[in-house]
Amino acid sequence: DQVDIIATNTAEPDSENRRLNPLGKIPTFVTDEGPLFDSRVILEAIDRFAGGDRLLPAAGPKRTTVQTRIALIDGIMDAAILIVYEGRLRPEGMQVQSVLDYQRGKIERSLAYLEDQALQYDKGKNPDAADIGLACMLDYLDFRQVFDWQEAAPSLVSWMTDFATSVSGYKETLPEGIAAAPWRR
């Protein structure tokens, strides 16, 4: 019925998050069943709590398609986070350019793949887990300024605009200070 969002410092050795999730990664979702970690596990649980077949199709090819998009989006996020960490944790001049290039290549190829899919957001439907993940990932790329995806993937700009203007409450989830984009107005 209710979700409390608790900010955590993943680098803090004695954090509550590390007590709940031995990996110390985010997100961690605490339920009556205990702590759940990994976005995919959490999505499965939320879908089940909501009665199923809402965030993830129940079975068959549609489910596989959604799960494949989720895996691609997770991979883009992993690459983006590694780029952010390389810049944040290594002093300037000690960053490994080949690592940055390799991760940017993953993002570039993956966005080109999504661009080729000619995705369109159906304004009348409830978003599935891949839709939500795609929106969050695109806004994360903007927020961290990891990759200029808007120029590389113009159809995703259109998709994002349709998503953000159709999904109730999405704009309220955006972090402060994120650059102005058409869907944030």
Locations of the language-model features?
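GST-like domain detector, emphasizing the conserved glutathione-binding G-site
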Residues: D1-Q97
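Serine-centered coil/turn micro-motif
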Residues: T10, G60, D128, P154, ...
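Non-transmembrane alpha-helical segments in soluble domains
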Residues: L43, D47, Q67-I70, L111, ...
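Short, hydrophobic secondary-structure boundary micro-motifs
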Residues: D53-A58, G93, K123, Q150-E151, ...
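A short, terminal or domain-edge coil/loop segment
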Residues: L55-T68, R109-A118, C136-R144, T173-R185
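GST-like fold's C-terminal all-alpha helical module
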Residues: I73-T161
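Long hydrophobic alpha-helical segments typical of transmembrane helices together
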Residues: E151-R185
